[in-house]
């Protein structure tokens, strides 16, 4: 199962429904894998990070960012805020995390890699 959001709480509820439905169909929950696709921007200025996501969403999809955010998981802000955001989905059941990085990919990859042990605990 590979959804794109919208938030960790809803993802967790849907994850539980996914597992329950699979078990009722005779599937072993240990055989199920769940991923999540999230859009993040890491910047010290949270407002600037969120604005960069909005700009990206508008240019990529040609739709209002508020509409896209209503069903896509997005977070802009400090590395601590972004890690907490990602951890919410992991805690709710995501086995794999796919990140769309908005901004300087190399810098964000280094920041996330330096703290990777915190992401998937």
Language-model region placement:
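Active-site-adjacent structural elements that line small-molecule/cofactor binding pockets in enzymes
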Residues: 1-121
